[in-house]
Amino acid sequence: MDSRQKTVVVVGAGFYGSVMAERFANELGWKVLVLEKRDHVGGNCWSAPDPDTGIEVHTYGPHIFHTSHELGWKYLNQFASFNNYRHTVWATRKGKVYPLPFGLAAINLLLGRRLSPAEARAWMQAEVAREGIAEPRNLEEKALSLIGRTLYEAFVKEYTEKHWGMKATELPAYIITRLPVRLTYDVGYYNDRWQGIPTEGYGALFNKMLAHPNIEVRLNSDYFSLRNSLPAHGLMVYTGPIDRFFDYKHGRLGWRSVRFEKQVLDIEDYQGTSVMNECDGDVPFTRTHEFKHFTPERTFKKTVVFREYSYLPGPDDDMYYPVRTTADLAIHAKYIDEARRVPHVAFGGRLGVYAYLDMENTVSTALDKYEELKNSIVAGRTGA
């Protein structure tokens, strides 16, 4: 690939693909063809006003943008303004409600005590020491080594097993990298400097991002139905499932998916917060979402509620969470080797790299990859 290359095909119009499309069109002046199999852009981050209530509903589950990286924040603010929403998460456990992540409020409510920060720290250290786990072999042992048994059994075990559809002792330890604990009464979920929801919704953000005249967006367009009509060695940004790109030749990668049951209720407020985790194993859904709370600057007389259910997806279902067992990672390593043999294709996004990425990471990795590709193009080297 060299500087004569003037066209790029982008497969998927989520954050990764949309950032790439915007950068190639706006900065390099290239023609960009975006192929999106759904009937809208935005991927799983898409949101749109509910026709019955006017409430902005996140079709594929809540997405709260949060970052401490100024570059990504400034980049997205070209296409949207954000409100001042600050995310909180609450959890229901045996009929009682607790704030997450773990902090003084949750610990003291659970124990029925009034521990100071120092006392809570000593209590947690004793909890962890009691387990005596130096080298965790699975998710359960990893969690016990971080927070101890009391918090784990109250808030993590049943919720995690419900979400993943597996026993915590069967899940790999690296699914949990950390379990944040704040020994304060701060119940804000994120620590990032910038947080919020686009004031006009994610749909408007993506539409503006892709509005450049050099960008052609084709909706309802499955790449795999069109691939034989595309240039064989033209530059491509691919954000679909990496295993499908290579026709599952090394096997399928493991995923979990979620589905949502929607209710429109003729009341002003259903649960008093945007997200409620359901920690009890006998409750079939994992979370309850109430979207009006994402826009506290607006008022509505009705409300929209989603109940979230986790399940093992079929081959045609949407993939949400990579399982990444040892077997999955062995398969993925083979696909990484395959990807190196197609240097004109840049794999990115959650599906393309088989990793869970939040929006901030997706935007920042797309911007970084674009700079890498741009530099390769200018130098006349292979770019992906």
Regions from the PLM with identified roles:
Residues 14-17, 39-41, 105, 161, ...:
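Short, solvent-exposed loop/turn segments at secondary-structure junctions
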Residues 339-355, 365:
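Short FAD-binding loop at a beta-strand-to-alpha-helix junction that anchors the flavin cofactor
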Residues 6-34:
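N-terminal Rossmann-like FAD-binding beta1-loop-alpha1 element of flavoenzymes
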